[in-house]
Amino acid sequence: MKKQILTLLLGGLMMTGAFAKTAVVYFSATGTTERMAKNAAKEMGADIFEIQPVHKYTDADLNWHDKKSLSSIECNDPKSRPAIANKIDISGYDTVVVCYPIWWAYAPKIVYTFVESQNWSGKKMITLCTSGGSGLGRSGKDLSKFAKGVDFKGGKDFTRGSGADVKKYIEGLLK
C-alpha cells in the first residue's frame, strides 16, 4: 500500500513540470507535420490529437499550382472553414501546441475551424509549422487572433527539427 501511494505521489510530481497538462493538436495532409507533432508529443510526454477533415485532401486538392484546387480555393476565401470529422476537447489542458503545414503563408483553414471551436480562456497556445520554405511568418499570431482569451506564447518552423529541438524550444517559451 505504501509503495502504491509513493508511486502515485511521485507520478503526480513528475506531471507538475513544464509539460503538465500539455496537448499537441495537429493537422497534416501529407504526413510531414504528423511526424513532427508525434515526435514533439513523445519528447514532452504530451497527449496528442489529430485534426481530421471530413473530406480527406487528395493530391489534386493540394496542388498549389492549380488555382481551382481545393486548398487554393480555401486559402483564398477568408470565410472558409472546412468541417472537422472528429471532436477534440482541450478543456483539460493548460498549454496547447498547435501544429500545421504552411499553405500560402498561412495555416490551413481547417486549423482555423479547430481554433474557433475551442474555449481558449486562460490557456497558452504555441504554434509549430512545417513548410516548404516560407516559414512560420505571421501564421501563429494570425491564428491566435481567433482564440479569444488565449495567451499566445510564440511559434516556430520545425520542418527539419527533432522532437528534442521542439521540447527545448517550448521549455524556453514556458519559463
Language-model features: locations:
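General helical structural elements
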Residues: L6-T7, A85
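Positively charged n-region of N-terminal signal peptides that target proteins for export
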Residues: M1-Q4
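Active-site-proximal alpha-helix that buttresses catalytic centers in soluble enzyme cores
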Residues: F19-K175
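Bacterial N-terminal signal peptides
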Residues: T7-M15
